């Protein structure tokens, strides 16, 4: 898509592309491009009109609220806020295995994820996982 945009916005690229087309093909492409641009303009105009109408409605509601003596806080009390269900974090799993790493530090492992290198080396040498249980 970037290549197409670059080609359409660069005059030299357009000239090179048009050289390879017949006049009829170039005019056909021009008509289609103009149609697409007109559709884009109409779409943009609709969006601007909808936003303008929305702002007018909001201004009308604000004026009506002021006329009736209603405050935004009162509306907030009535409508409240949307409650977003936040998924609670899972509690960390307790450690099941203890080992001493290459630096001589005492470490623990929950049993999930990749097996720590010292435990894996011991398992490769014939030890059992139960040898490391806490």
Swiss-Prot record:
Region feature (Disordered): 106-134
Gene3D superfamilies: H-NS histone-like proteins, Histone-like protein H-NS, C-terminal domain
Function according to Swiss-Prot or TrEMBL: A DNA-binding protein implicated in transcriptional repression and chromosome organization and compaction. Binds nucleation sites in AT-rich DNA and bridges them, forming higher-order nucleoprotein complexes and condensing the chromosome. As many horizontally transferred genes are AT-rich, it plays a central role in silencing foreign genes. A subset of genes are repressed by H-NS in association with other proteins.
Family the entry assigns: Belongs to the histone-like protein H-NS family.
Gene Ontology terms, MF aspect: bent DNA binding; DNA-binding transcription repressor activity; minor groove of adenine-thymine-rich DNA binding; protein dimerization activity; structural constituent of chromatin; transcription cis-regulatory region binding
GO cellular component term of the entry, any: cytosol
Identification of the protein by name: DNA-binding protein H-NS homolog
DNA-binding region: 112-117
Subcellular localization, as worded in the UniProt entry: Cytoplasm, Nucleoid
Subunit and partners: Homodimer that oligomerizes on DNA into higher-order complexes that form bridges between disparate regions of DNA compacting it.
Coiled-coil regions, chain positions: none
Cited Pfam families: Histone_HNS, Histone_HNS_N
Taxonomic source organism: Haemophilus influenzae (strain ATCC 51907 / DSM 11121 / KW20 / Rd)
Assigned keywords, A-Z: Cytoplasm, DNA-binding, Repressor, Transcription, Transcription regulation
